[in-house]
């Protein structure tokens, strides 16, 4: 990833509009900022949330609070706790949380 054309700036996430996204179970609440081609989101999941699809887009994800269970399409599962991150490239292992 190469980031260009993004001047220095601060993001006050408490002022970014929150949108709701329903999963197979539970809800995800996204706060999204777009910087050129780069999308940055702060996401809150309700307990028991599970995405309604497998994702093949690349992500860098950092768990700030609670636990997040991540499932790969090949059956592997991972539990993230505060301070743990994952990173995956576009079109690599399909995943869902």
Model-found features: residue ranges?
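A short, N-terminal "cap"/entry segment at the start of jelly-roll beta-barrel domains
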Residues: 1-41
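Short, conserved beta-strand element in jelly-roll/cupin
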Residues: 45, 54-70
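Short acidic-glycine-tyrosine-enriched beta hairpin
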Residues: 74-91
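Short, Lys/Arg-rich amphipathic alpha-helical interaction segments
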Residues: 96-97
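A short, sequence-level motif marking secondary-structure junctions
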Residues: 14-16, 46-48, 82-87
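Conserved short histidine dyad/triad with adjacent acidic residue
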Residues: 36-56, 89-91
């Amino acid at each position: 990833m190469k980031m260009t054309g993004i001047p220095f700036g601060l993001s006050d996430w408490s002022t970014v509009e929150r949108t709701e996204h329903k999963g197979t179970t539970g809800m995800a609440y996204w706060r999204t900022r777009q910087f050129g081609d780069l999308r940055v989101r702060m996401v809150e999941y309700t307990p028991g949330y599970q995405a309604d699809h497998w994702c093949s887009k690349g992500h860098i994800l950092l768990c700030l609070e609670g636990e997040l269970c991540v499932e790969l399409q090949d059956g592997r599962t991972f539990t993230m706790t505060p301070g743990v991150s994952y990173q995956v490239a576009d079109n690599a292992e399909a995943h869902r949380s």
